[in-house]
């Protein structure tokens, strides 16, 4: 019986709670752990697109997502002197169509966690050792506790500690696409009203948006650089690098950076893809960015997480808990979808951060039209199996 199959899910981002939801719905017994003290508030804006929209509706959370969406009404391109070059309707500016929705990462995770309120979840917990044999997986926690599970599913992000413990370095690749991304919340000092501003020039891009939280604004930075940080996880090194990279950029950039110390949700990372021939090893599976991050610029990581969660849990149900059969199908079914979205991620990375002094209306419209067409294609480039 599947209800006796105990599954540890590592990570409370999008993929972790999503796969826990489907595991419980399909009759398994998942438990969640998360190294942070609580669900992180705010964060980057994420899109629910294509097939992922259908999955959100099946989960009964789509209406809640719509109620908490960002509601950006207008997007404006500005030059480094602050002159408005042109503007677009909010959904077009964000490359969204039909019933696709944008929501802050923290709000989406909060919705997902409410949907799995009956599933045990332990915060401030992490794994320091994983051992497996033919019968089970033995997990040693940082507090010294040792537990046995039938399966482990790791959804602990692009810098997955689980991936490093379970897979050898020749079994995965971190492919740096040559750019960096940063985001953090600051006071809405410009008084933006459901608006996003974007300034792009000389391989760099700065955005500022404010939506339903009128007193706050989300700042975003993307830029190309060949410089490699000594420690990509060192926040002080990240902030120094960001300051140095944008010190002469113009527009509102210095005003935004001067407010960076006020932020409590600073995010910074290299724009990277994860590539693996197999996302499973024995009784352990990777999911979401830990397995197949398509790059933050693609806007597709959220959708890969939703689809991957549904298929992994569904194949375990279909195989009646036979993890070897289920994991094989998970790899087979999802790889073409992942490859299409990762190829799109590379293309987006190359089409943004232009060397031009400014992005003309013609360039922006041509790029927008191509992105809309490509997103619609890659977001729906899989036929979802039915498991119920």
UniProtKB/Swiss-Prot annotation:
EC number of this enzyme: 1.14.13.-
Activity regulation (record text): Inhibited by anhydrotetracycline.
Annotated GO biological process: response to antibiotic
Chain positions recorded as FAD binding sites: 12-15, 34-36, 44-47, 105, 267, 289, 296-302
Catalytic activity reported: a tetracycline + NADPH + O2 + H(+) = a (1S,10aS)-3-(CONH2)-1-(Me2N)-3,3a,4,6-(HO)4-2,5-dioxo-1H,10aH,11H,11aH-cyclopenta[b]anthracene + CO + NADP(+) + H2O; 7-chlorotetracycline + NADPH + O2 + H(+) = (1S,10S,10aS)-3-(CONH2)-9-Cl-1-(Me2N)-3,3a,4,10-(HO)4-10-Me-2,5-dioxo-1H,10aH,11H,11aH-cyclopenta[b]anthracen-6-olate + CO + NADP(+) + H2O
Cofactor note: Binds 1 FAD per subunit; it is seen bound in two conformations.
Pfam families, sorted: FAD_binding_3
Keyword Cell cycle: no
Family per similarity comment: Belongs to the aromatic-ring hydroxylase family.
Family annotation (NCBIfam families): tet_destruct (NF033476)
PANTHER family membership: MONOOXYGENASE, OXIDOREDUCTASE-RELATED
Protein's UniProt name: Flavin-dependent monooxygenase
Organism: Unknown prokaryotic organism
Organism lineage string: Bacteria, environmental samples
């Amino acid at each position: 019986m599947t209800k006796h199959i105990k599954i540890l899910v590592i990570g409370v981002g999008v993929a972790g709670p999503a796969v826990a939801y489907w595991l419980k719905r399909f009759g398994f017994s998942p438990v969640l752990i998360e190294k942070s003290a609580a669900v992180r508030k705010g964060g980057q804006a994420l899109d629910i697109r294509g097939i992922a929209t259908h999955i959100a509706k099946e989960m009964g959370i789509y209406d809640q997502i719509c109620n908490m969406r960002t509601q950006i009404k207008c997007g404006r391109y500005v030059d480094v002197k602050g002159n408005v070059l042109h503007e677009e309707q909010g959904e077009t500016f964000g490359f969204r169509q039909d019933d696709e929705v944008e929501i802050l990462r923290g709000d989406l995770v909060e919705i997902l966690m409410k949907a799995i309120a009956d599933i045990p979840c332990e915060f401030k917990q992490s794994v320091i050792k994983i051992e497996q044999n033919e019968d089970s997986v033995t997990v040693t926690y940082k507090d010294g506790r040792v537990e046995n599970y039938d399966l482990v599913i790791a959804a602990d992000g692009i810098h997955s500690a689980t991936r490093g413990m379970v897979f050898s370095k020749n079994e995965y690749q971190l492919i740096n696409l040559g750019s960096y991304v940063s985001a953090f919340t600051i006071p809405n000092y410009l008084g933006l009203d459901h608006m996003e501003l974007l300034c792009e020039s000389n391989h760099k891009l700065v955005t500022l948006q404010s939506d339903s939280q009128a007193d706050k604004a989300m700042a975003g930075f993307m830029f190309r650089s060949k410089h490699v940080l000594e420690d990509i996880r060192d926040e002080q090194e990240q902030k120094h690098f960001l300051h140095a990279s944008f010190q002469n950029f113009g527009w509102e950039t210095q005003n935004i950076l001067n407010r960076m110390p006020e932020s409590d949700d600073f995010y910074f990372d290299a724009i990277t893809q994860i590539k693996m021939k197999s996302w499973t090893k024995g009784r352990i599976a990777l999911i979401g960015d830990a397995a197949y991050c398509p790059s933050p610029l693609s806007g597709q990581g959220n959708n890969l997480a939703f689809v991957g969660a549904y298929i992994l849990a569904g194949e375990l149900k279909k195989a009646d808990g036979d993890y070897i059969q289920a994991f094989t199908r998970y790899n087979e079914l999802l790889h073409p979808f992942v490859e299409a979205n990762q190829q799109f991620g590379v293309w987006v990375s190359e089409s943004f951060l232009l060397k031009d002094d400014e992005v003309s209306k013609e360039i922006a419209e041509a790029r927008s039209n191509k992105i809309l067409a490509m997103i619609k294609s890659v977001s729906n480039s899989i036929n979802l199996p039915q498991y119920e």
